[in-house]
Regions:
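Short "domain-exit" segments at the C-terminal end of structured domains
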Residues: 613-617
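Gly/Ser/Thr-rich loops at beta-strand to alpha-helix junctions
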Residues: 89-91, 114, 161-171, 191-193
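Glycine-rich phosphate-binding "P-loop"
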Residues: 119-144, 541
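Domain-scale signature associated with acetyltransferase and cell-envelope carbohydrate enzymes
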Residues: 380-530, 552-554, 563, 571, ...
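Electropositive, gly/pro-rich neighborhoods at or near active sites that engage anionic ligands
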Residues: 49-52, 57-93, 97-99, 367-375
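Iron-sulfur cluster-binding cysteine motifs and their immediate structural context
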Residues: 2-4, 9, 15-32, 36-38, ...
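Long, compositionally biased charged/polar accessory segments in the mid-to-C-terminal portions
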Residues: 103-106, 210-381
Length: 617
């Protein structure tokens, strides 16, 4: 019988529980959130099946026989852009699953449960594919999964199963014999994180937003695949985009790999040959190595065909994919954990999980106390000064007056809060006019580029007016306003801009009350945003001359659109050209017309405007 005395010798695959016909094995969840088998000795007949099925005990013979000496390696994307957006990388799994569904077969993979735990699920309907695709990044329960797969195989229909390398090794042990109608797919696994770790992170997010999480996408593509951003949606309609470098859940895993299962630190399932027919994952490689037609920053898959069966399966999917041979050496170099196990950090595992059981915030406070702070090193400060000088040089050229204006407003203007060493400055191009009341305030937490010119010789003026007690803030990232802009913040009004975006020629922004523009929200040409009607009074019940505007994160304001007073635009929306918007715009929708109406829903789009460094302009 199985007897776990060393937790590093159990991968939590659940195969021993499924193979026991006497139901003598149950799984106990420890303080780390991982499960381990416990044997009821009164039910156990000591038949030894649980030991025979264990992939850890039987590491010497789990490798696939008859495989390629060196796997065939491919870069791959799904032709369906919606599938690619919804996938973790390039949509390889969905292409494989589609081929199986087309033959009325079964597809197995991981799905979220209502409590945000994860289970392996065997599906016979293509409608389940959206739940099955995308990596979940925590350990999944497989109770009953092996039995379900065995029964599906007996029907003679094709079956595809996808899981971690240890789970798929366990599948081979459980089935005992090869099945021609079985396609086994594993993924590149760094190490499997504790379900408790993820649960506490969800609790942390829910406390932060005062609402329950209703949708979670670990790797969202809207801000670019390489940003490793996460999108979380809440019951109160909040949407939170979290960049990888700003995500405590991701950062803590790299700082403290002990969040992963003990067996992950000496994993016998690394490298090649594999137990699977196909291995899939993200194609991380050196810049320029991925063919351009396969790389548009919305995800590219790497696929290893480990044997002839896997290669044949890929060939059957060729109508659904765009693929190209890729260097095996390049692919393995970019995916370190394809070949090597996790390494322990200096942190005490027991202490970490004691803290995690208190709360996720307690872990941040103890292990990453500086997380989210913007304190810069000396090297970074020198880079920031160089960035400022380069930005001013590009804006002013040899124009002494523009140089003086930049120095004055950055170093000697009390109305503008700047700190060049901390990368908080304004870059003023030629033909820009600033009119700041002595009691006005412009608060810069990131670079603000005013009057940027694509046509260098243009004399098109840009204007910024902030009246008495008016306040304008650039909150998070660099914000670029092209030439021809007219920004006016009236007496006592408040304009806040998230940044990490740019707005094209001819912006007309009038703030008399309060306008909030979220991060990664930019605009096309001649966009108008105004929260007031110029003090004109109309005899309509409920009419107000000024009503605040809220534009949330990752919104696309296209050419000549107008945002009227009282408008709220939820995250991810697109405002079509020449639309006039007043009222509420739902998340991830496209609106068009005058007045604007919803014409599309559940639309996701890639934003490149978050790359708005002044030195790139």
């Amino acid at each position: 019988m199985v007897n776990i005395t060393d937790k590093s010798k159990c991968c939590g695959c659940n195969a021993c529980g499924d193979v026991c016909i006497h139901q003598a094995i149950k799984f106990h969840i420890d303080v780390e959130g991982f499960w381990y088998p416990e044997v009821d000795k009164d039910k156990c007949t000591d038949c030894g099946l649980c030991e025979k099925v264990c992939p850890i005990i039987n590491t010497e013979d789990w490798h696939e026989s008859g495989g390629f000496e060196k796997p065939h390696c491919y870069a791959l994307i799904n032709k369906n852009i919606e599938v690619r957006f919804d996938s973790t990388s390039g949509g390889a799994f969905s292409a494989l699953a589609d081929e199986i569904y087309k033959k009325s077969g079964y597809v197995g993979g991981a799905i979220y449960n209502e409590d945000w735990s994860v289970s392996q699920f065997l599906s016979s309907s293509r409608e389940d594919l959206s739940r099955l695709r995308s990596s979940k990044y925590l350990q999944s329960h497989l109770d009953g999964f092996y039995i379900a797969v065995r029964e599906a195989l007996k029907t003679g229909k094709p079956v595809l199963v996808c899981g971690s390398p240890c789970q798929m090794a366990a599948m081979k042990r459980f089935l005992r014999k090869p099945y021609e109608n079985l396609m086994v797919v594993d993924y590149i696994c760094r190490g499997i994180a504790s379900p408790l770790y993820f649960k506490q992170f969800i609790n942390y997010l829910e406390q932060k937003h005062h609402s329950t999480v209703v949708y979670y996408k670990a790797k969202s593509k809207e801000l670019g695949w390489r940003t490793l951003s996460t999108r979380v949606e809440f019951a109160n309609k909040d949407v939170d985009y979290i960049l990888g470098k700003e995500n405590p859940w991701l950062s803590m895993q790299y700082k403290i790999p002990e969040v992963c299962r003990p067996s992950c630190f000496d994993c016998p399932f690394k490298g090649f040959p594999r137990t699977s027919d196909l291995t899939i994952g993200d194609l991380w490689s050196s810049p320029g190595s991925i063919p351009k037609e396969l790389d548009s920053d919305i995800g590219t898959s790497v696929v290893f065909a480990n044997n002839e069966k896997g290669a044949d399966m890929l060939n059957k999917c060729k109508k659904k994919i765009i693929w190209s041979d890729f260097s095996f050496e390049e692919a393995t170099k970019g995916n370190y954990h394809l070949m090597y196990s996790l390494k322990h950090s200096e942190h005490n595992r027991e202490d970490f999980f004691k803290t995690l059981n208190i709360s996720f915030q307690a872990c941040i406070d103890k292990y990453m106390p500086d997380f989210g702070q913007t304190q810069k090193s000396l090297k970074e400060k020198i880079k920031n000064v160089a960035c400022f000088i380069k930005g001013v040089t590009g804006a002013a050229g040899w124009n002494i007056g523009t140089w003086i204006k930049n120095m004055r407003y950055n170093l000697f203007c009390r109305q503008i809060e700047t700190d060049i060493l901390e990368r908080k400055f304004i870059i003023i191009n030629k033909y820009c006019t600033l009119d700041l009341h002595p009691k006005a305030k412009l608060v810069l937490n990131a670079p603000f580029i005013m009057g940027y010119k694509r046509i260098k010789g243009s004399k098109l003026e840009s204007r910024l007016l902030i009246e008495e007690n008016g306040r304008m803030e650039i909150k998070y990232g660099s914000y670029t306003v092209y030439y021809g802009a007219d920004i006016q913040v009236f007496k006592g009004a408040h304009l806040e801009i998230g940044g990490d975006a740019s707005v094209n020629v001819g912006l007309n922004l009038i703030c008399a009350n309060h306008i909030s523009i979220g991060r990664w929200t930019g605009g096309g040409r001649n966009v108008t945003i105004r929260d007031n009607n110029g003090e004109h009074h109309i005899s309509i019940r409920g009419y107000k001359t000024s009503i605040p505007i809220v534009i949330k994160e990752h919104v696309w304001l296209t050419e000549n659109c107008t945002i009227m007073p009282g408008t709220t635009i939820e995250a991810g929306a697109i405002i079509s050209a020449r639309s006039v918007v007043q009222g509420h715009v739902p998340s991830f929708s496209i609106v068009s017309g005058d007045p604007a109406k919803v014409i599309e829903t559940k639309v996701y789009w890639l934003s490149l405007i978050h790359i708005s460094e002044p030195t790139r302009r």
